[in-house]
Design a protein with these regions (language model features):
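Alpha-helical interface subdomain recognition
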Residues: 1-86, 105-110, 117, 121, ...
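Short glycine/proline-enriched turns and hinge-like loops at secondary-structure junctions
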Residues: 70-71, 137-139, 163-167
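N-terminal glycine-rich flavin-associated loop
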Residues: 88-109
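Short beta-strand-to-turn element immediately C-terminal to the catalytic PLP-Schiff-base lysine
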Residues: 103-106, 146, 172-175, 184-187, ...
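A short, Trp-centered hydrophobic/proline-enriched beta-strand micro-motif
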Residues: 121-132
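Cytochrome P450 C-terminal beta-domain/meander region
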Residues: 137-155
Length: 372
């Protein structure tokens, strides 16, 4: 188990409360059952999570949010770790990225329309930023937005979009004559095409969202028209930190029960854990896991404080964690032997989650290329 030495009592309470809630409401048996649920999660369950603060930690107090420690991103990263440890469902990342953006940049009118229900868990938001075959960069957006009188017309395709088929609101990034802009679009908008995608994760749903001349009023613009590049960078940094925290939480749990398995399982009359070759391998794995946790905490602090190198540190974290965590879980599968590749064992649930996280919002190679 990874030990956090710098948590405040309030943060420890948030972590422990989240852990107990997840263990009680979505044990792995329930996660398997939710694989048959079209949404991948229960709306009533998500509202109960919102009551614990999951949706409001990145939102300013004047708009109904607030954190337990005045370090909202660190608090939310703790929640993400616990959700990774239980392979939990729910739109944690997407809804929080959108809620944070609306809190910071939306007009009072727009925020009052969407934020209250997002914070209460009654509605869900999707972050429509990724485009098929393209990197997430300000100059890499192919989707277009052009004026038509007092309105804007959106044309293009976004995908894969997390909770795209379940969202009530879409935060859409598009390029127009003014530059990069963002729009808040209701899922009920005409000419919106939602195509569910088959995913590896059993409970995390993605979709491709087609905007075939979707008309939105000028009041749907979030922030400054043509000035969304800094907002996009801030959103990506937040998303990468939460992804890394979730991957670390999942890998930590898998490592723990793999070590226990090595003590319980015998081979040639000896516990697996007694073999020196496996001891050395476990030591290497523990080093990589602690390193993944350390770079995630460092990235969280950098993004939380708005450090000048926050974007660089967040990308370094995703590159390292996104590479190491899937490898670590694959090693754990090997150490379990044949039982590790069965449907009945829980290992594949965790491997599915970290592989999806690795590929979403830029894989390690893409982030290394960006850093270079």
């Amino acid at each position: 188990v990874i030990v956090d030495l710098d948590l405040t009592p309030d943060q420890e309470l948030l972590r422990d409360t989240t852990r107990k809630f997840l263990q009680t409401t979505v044990p792995l048996t329930e996660v398997r059952a939710l694989a048959e649920n079209p949404d991948g999660f229960d709306r009533g369950w998500w509202q109960r999570g919102a009551e614990l603060g999951w949706t409001s930690l990145l939102v300013d107090e004047r708009r109904g949010g607030g954190s337990v420690s005045e370090a909202g991103l660190r608090d939310l990263a703790l929640v993400a770790e616990e959700m990774g440890a239980m392979v939990s469902p729910g739109p944690l990342l997407a809804t929080n990225v959108v809620a944070q953006t609306l809190s910071r940049e939306a007009s009072e009118e727009l925020a009052s329309r969407a934020l209250p229900d997002l914070l209460s868990g009654q509605s869900v938001a999707a972050w429509c930023v990724a485009e098929p075959g393209r990197d997430i960069t300000a100059d890499g957006m192919k989707m277009r937005a052009h004026r038509d009188g007092a309105d804007f017309i959106l044309d293009g395709v976004k995908g894969p979009v997390e909770v795209g088929g379940q969202a009530d609101w879409f935060l859409v990034t598009a390029t127009g004559p003014e530059g990069l802009s963002q729009f808040l679009v209701p899922s009920s908008a005409p000419s919106l095409r939602i195509t569910p995608l088959h995913g590896l994760d059993l409970v995390r749903r993605h979709a491709e969202i087609g905007f075939d001349g979707v008309r939105v009023p000028s009041s749907a613009v979030v922030g400054v028209l043509g000035g969304a590049a800094p907002s996009l960078e801030a959103q990506l940094q937040t998303a990468l930190v939460l992804q890394c925290a979730e991957m670390v939480g999942a890998t930590d749990r898998v490592f723990d029960f793999t070590v226990q398995y090595a003590f319980d399982r015998s081979s040639f009359g000896r516990a697996l854990a007694s073999y020196q070759a496996l001891k050395h391998r476990f030591a290497d794995m523990k080093l990589w896991l602690e390193s993944a946790h350390a770079i995630t905490v460092d990235a969280t602090r950098a993004v939380q404080s708005g450090a000048p190198d926050a974007g660089e540190v967040a990308r370094i974290a995703k590159a390292y964690v996104g590479e190491r965590c899937p490898e670590l879980i694959q090693d754990c599968v090997q150490m379990h032997g044949g039982i590790g590749v069965t449907w009945e064992h829980d290992l594949h649930l965790y491997l599915r989650r970290v592989v999806v996280d690795r590929q979403t919002y830029g894989d390690p190679m893409q982030h290394r290329d960006h850093l270079a």
